[in-house]
């Protein structure tokens, strides 16, 4: 492991026990203490480059002060423009920021854009309250506009500061003002969530020794047989997954120990977004005694390891990976896509996601392969799967799962190789196999759809899939 990876690991390992110290604290202790820890971590790891995050916060605060009722898109433009300056800073003879500064800046960008949207929603709710004489739902609306100091507290809260998960200001506010946090379980959920992490960590260390990424950049690698080159992307993506599985599980444990993002199960919370229905934070029975509620941590869940590995479709794989960020992308980017189409909307979203990750060409080459895979999936679903028997659907789904994993293996190479030259060289050495296969399957699906008899639209299965699609995008 590199020194930076060891530093990340130390931060993650320290966040879990630290959470227990803050769990039962007063709102002031939680607010100021968590921010103090976050500021200390930022200064220690980012040094003078900590100014980048401070400037971004100040700029966002000014936008909210000047344009409180329409601050979402200006904030999106401001934070993403600053990201471009941040990534190209060396061209201005300014020292390059540390990797930790980049991590802070990435998460901060998401939080500030979300905060601006929450401010807009606050004013919209107030207007609705005045015009309709009805009180709007409070489950997702912030109670007041945060001051500059409160914005700094939220932005530098040590929870999720560098590794995620992303969370909204309302989630943070609810944590500060939790009712009876001592009754919210932390230890058992933490142990349960932590169980697979050691296995993933050992697998990561072992696989990294036998399949180093740097080997792909050598001439010797390209002298190997085609099948070996093709196979190498499988362990590369495996190593990539194990590393992030460990990091995100530990990051979630840091939230769980502090009871951060804990809501009653009845709230039907979603990763990133929080509760989706009205819920009672405290319930009493007929005798007036407090009813013990069942809680979950879905709001801060950032990875579904089983879902990511064993879901059938490429589009489902995205939902199970970096889940809080996927919610942010769906909520603030996909829904505002200039073209209302799954493929074009996904392409727009993936372009923004690539830009958010960085300016390395490998990001764009990888992310912009996803819409092609989605188009192939949709084409084969329409042209073949819906016309076969139940046993045929099962076979189709197993083949689909295998190809989905190979598609992610292929795209991962661009994500880790980063440069255009290295990514293109590797993809060329395996004859752009996934691109060729995706285009072929897209065309095949179209041909099969033309030859197959038309089925009545809106069958029960299609309605169920559409309902699930809408639910996941809300």
Swiss-Prot record:
Q: Which GO terms describe its cellular component?
A: endoplasmic reticulum membrane; membrane; mitochondria-associated endoplasmic reticulum membrane contact site
User: So which stretches are on the Lumenal side?
Assistant: 23-33, 94-193, 261-427
**Where does this polypeptide localize?**
Endoplasmic reticulum membrane
Select a single GO molecular function from the record's annotations and give it: lysophospholipid acyltransferase activity
Domain of life of the organism encoding this protein: Eukaryota
User: Do the record's keywords include Amino-acid biosynthesis?
Assistant: no
Q: Which residues lie on this side of the membrane: Cytoplasmic?
A: 1-5, 58-73, 212-230, 449-473
**Residue intervals passing through the bilayer:** 6-22, 34-57, 74-93, 194-211, 231-260, 428-448
Indicate which residues are glycosylated according to the record: 322
The EC number(s) given in the record are 2.3.1.-
Give one GO biological process term.
Answer: regulation of triglyceride metabolic process
What are the UniProt keywords, alphabetically? Answer: Acyltransferase, Endoplasmic reticulum, Glycoprotein, Lipid biosynthesis, Lipid metabolism, Membrane, Phospholipid biosynthesis, Phospholipid metabolism, Transferase, Transmembrane, Transmembrane helix
Q: In which pathway does it act?
A: Lipid metabolism; phospholipid metabolism
Q: Which InterPro entries match?
A: LPLAT_7/PORCN-like, MBOAT_fam
Q: What class of enzyme is it?
A: transferase
How does the record classify its membrane topology? Multi-pass membrane protein
Q: Does the keyword Chaperone apply?
A: no
As its record notes, the protein acts as a catalyst of: a 1-acyl-sn-glycero-3-phospho-(1D-myo-inositol) + (5Z,8Z,11Z,14Z)-eicosatetraenoyl-CoA = a 1-acyl-2-(5Z,8Z,11Z,14Z-eicosatetraenoyl)-sn-glycero-3-phospho-(1D-myo-inositol) + CoA; (5Z,8Z,11Z,14Z)-eicosatetraenoyl-CoA + 1-hexadecanoyl-sn-glycero-3-phosphocholine = 1-hexadecanoyl-2-(5Z,8Z,11Z,14Z-eicosatetraenoyl)-sn-glycero-3-phosphocholine + CoA; a 1-acyl-sn-glycero-3-phospho-(1D-myo-inositol) + an acyl-CoA = a 1,2-diacyl-sn-glycero-3-phospho-(1D-myo-inositol) + CoA; 1-octadecanoyl-sn-glycero-3-phospho-(1D-myo-inositol) + (5Z,8Z,11Z,14Z)-eicosatetraenoyl-CoA = 1-octadecanoyl-2-(5Z,8Z,11Z,14Z-eicosatetraenoyl)-sn-glycero-3-phospho-(1D-myo-inositol) + CoA
In the record, the note on similarity to other proteins reads:
Belongs to the membrane-bound acyltransferase family.
Q: What does this protein do?
A: Acyltransferase which catalyzes the transfer of an acyl group from an acyl-CoA to a lysophosphatidylinositol (1-acylglycerophosphatidylinositol or LPI) leading to the production of a phosphatidylinositol (1,2-diacyl-sn-glycero-3-phosphoinositol or PI) and participates in the reacylation step of the phospholipid remodeling pathway also known as the Lands cycle. Prefers arachidonoyl-CoA as the acyl donor, thus contributing to the regulation of free levels arachidonic acid in cell.
The protein's name in its UniProt record = Membrane-bound acylglycerophosphatidylinositol O-acyltransferase mboat7
Annotated source species: Xenopus laevis
């Amino acid at each position: 492991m590199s020194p930076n990876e060891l530093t990340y690991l130390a931060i993650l390992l320290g966040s879990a026990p630290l959470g227990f110290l803050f769990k039962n604290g007063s709102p002031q202790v939680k607010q100021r203490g968590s921010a103090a820890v976050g500021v200390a971590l930022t200064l220690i790891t980012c040094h003078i480059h900590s100014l980048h995050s401070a400037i971004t916060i100040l700029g966002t605060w000014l936008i909210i002060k000047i344009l409180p009722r329409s601050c979402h898109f200006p904030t999106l433009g401001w934070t993403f423009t600053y990201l471009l300056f941040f990534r190209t800073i060396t061209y201005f003879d300014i020292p390059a920021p540390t990797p930790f500064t980049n991590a802070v800046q990435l998460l901060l960008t998401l939080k500030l854009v979300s905060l601006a949207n929450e401010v807009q929603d606050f004013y919209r709710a107030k207007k609705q309250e005045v015009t309709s004489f009805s009180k709007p739902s409070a489950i997702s609306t912030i109670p007041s506009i945060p001051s500059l100091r409160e914005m700094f507290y939220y932005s530098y809260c040590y929870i999720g500061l560098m590794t995620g998960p992303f969370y909204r200001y309302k989630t943070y506010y609810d944590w500060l003002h939790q009712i009876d946090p001592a009754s919210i379980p932390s230890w058992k959920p933490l142990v349960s969530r932590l169980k697979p992490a050691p296995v993933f960590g050992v697998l990561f260390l072992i696989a990294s020794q036998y399949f180093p990424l740097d080997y792909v950049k050598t001439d010797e690698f390209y002298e190997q047989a085609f099948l070996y080159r093709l196979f190498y992307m499988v362990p590369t993506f495996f190593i990539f997954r194990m590393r992030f599985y460990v990091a995100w599980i530990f990051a979630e444990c840091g939230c769980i120990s502090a009871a951060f993002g804990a809501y009653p199960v009845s709230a039907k919370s979603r990763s990133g977004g929080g509760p989706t229905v009205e819920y009672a934070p405290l319930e009493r029975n007929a005798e007036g005694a407090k009813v013990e509620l069942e809680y979950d941590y879905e709001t801060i869940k950032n990875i579904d390891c089983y879902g990511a590995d064993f879901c059938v479709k490429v589009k489902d794989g995205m939902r199970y990976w970096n889940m809080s960020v996927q919610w942010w992308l769906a909520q603030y980017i996909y829904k505002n896509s200039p073209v209302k189409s799954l493929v074009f909307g996904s392409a727009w979203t993936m372009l923004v996601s690539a830009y958010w990750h960085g300016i390395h060409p490998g990001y764009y080459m990888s992310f912009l392969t996803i819409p092609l895979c989605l188009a192939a999936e949709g084409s084969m679903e329409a042209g073949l799967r819906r016309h076969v028997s139940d046993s045929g659907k099962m076979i189709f789904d197993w083949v689909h799962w295998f190809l989905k994993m190979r598609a992610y293996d292929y795209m991962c190479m661009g994500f880790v190789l980063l440069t255009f030259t290295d990514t293109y060289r590797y993809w060329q050495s395996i004859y752009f196999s996934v691109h060729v296969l995706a285009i072929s399957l897209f065309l095949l699906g179209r041909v099969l759809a033309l030859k197959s008899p038309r089925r009545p639209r809106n069958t029960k299965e299609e309605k169920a899939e559409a309902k699930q699609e809408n639910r996941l995008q809300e």
